[in-house]
Structures are given as structure tokens and as C-alpha cells.
Amino acid sequence: GVLPFTGIDEPVQGILLGSVIIVVTGAVDDLVSLRPWVKLVLQIAAAVVAIRHGVVIRILTNPGDASAEAIALGALSVPVTLLWIVGMTNALNLIDGLDGLATGLALIAAVGMGGALFFIGYPQATLVYFVFAGSCLAFLRYNFHPASVFLGDTGSMYLGFVLSTLPLFMKSSDSLFVSLGVPMLAMGVPIFDTALAILRRTLRAVLTREEHGADEGNTRVMQADTDHLHHRILRQLVSQRKMYTPTM
């Protein structure tokens, strides 16, 4: 094992080491603004570290049908897990456009996952999620509008990384729905917003490439915009405080 994490279970080591990469990446990005592709490569590196330590989606099950046979992902385990971790990390990062929004959504997701785990008989995992939720709630006191402390890329990427990796070292098949289903439901808004942003920017890049050339089009894919769901709701409601209810 790695010296600072000696004696800790291997999957937990992977999450901790991956978190270090995510936090350092976010801190550097907050200070000097990394290129989007550099940030993506480092996010993938963090996910690979977690995967190499056993944080992997190996099977898919149907929680509504106890008799249904579990589907082994086999060779697809690694790419599916990589997509899940990097996708969730970016989902929280992209949704962090207003005071308290990413923190509030992470809080809701953690409470939802902790509650689901409690009802299927995982008290220790429940405690982990409720501690995580408690830290989000304490931070939200200072992050809610008007915020005095901000997540930055460091905090938002870390929240997404932890929420995506924590459930994945539970081994039993009956917990898999909690591992993927509950996070996807609780994080539905940022996941949908991320998918929409990728589609929107890709379409704009194609149109830009036709008008101004390939280099300009490629830049547009990585370029931030103000067309996220929370920006659209804010333009309609004017007040940040009013917009939290429909978003969360």
C-alpha cells in the first residue's frame, strides 16, 4: 500500500488517492485556469487510480425483480466505470454556477443514498453518507446566497468524484441499485444538464467549424456558456433564492 494510507482497505485507498489528484487539479485550475483537455486528462487519471484499486462497476441487476439474473459487464466494467466517475465529477463541476447549488444537490444526493442504504440494511455505509451530508450542510451555511465561501473547481469536482466512487466498493448485488440508481435519480438535474451542455456545445462547434474552420469549432466544444438549466431558470425568476426550489 501507499505509506500514508497503510492499513486502509484498497478501494478506500483508491478513493483517497484519486481525491488527491482531483483536489490538486481543482486547486491549480482555480489559480491559473487549466485548459479543459488538461483537466479532463487529470480527471481520467483520478478515475483510473480508483479503478486500479477495485472501485469498479462489475454487474448490473434489476432491483425490482429478485429472480432476475445479474448481468456481468466483463470487459465493459472499466470503460463503464470510467465514464460514470468522470461524468459525475463533471456534472457537479458544471452545475456549480450559482451560490450553494452544487453543495445543495450533493447534500440531497448523500441523504438519498444514505437513506436507501439504511432501509436495505447497510448501517455503516449509511453513517458515511450522513457524515458527508452533514459536512455539506455545514458548508452550505456559508455557501448559500449571498455566499461568503465558494467551492471553486476544487470543491465541486471533489463532491462529484466522491459521490460517484463511494458506492462502488459495496460488493453485494442488492446494493447495486443504490450504487447507480439512487445517485442517478438524486443527481438527475446535473446529469441531464451535463448531457444537454455537451450536445449544445457540439452542435455549436459543428456550425462554427463550417463558418470559421476546424480550430475555432474545436475551441467552442470546450468553451463555457450561460445556457445551463440554472442560468435559464435564473433569467426567468430574477432572484437566486427563488430559483433553488425548481432546480433542487
PLM features: what roles do these ranges have?
Residues 13, 71-81, 126:
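Membrane-interfacial loop-to-helix junctions in multi-pass transporters
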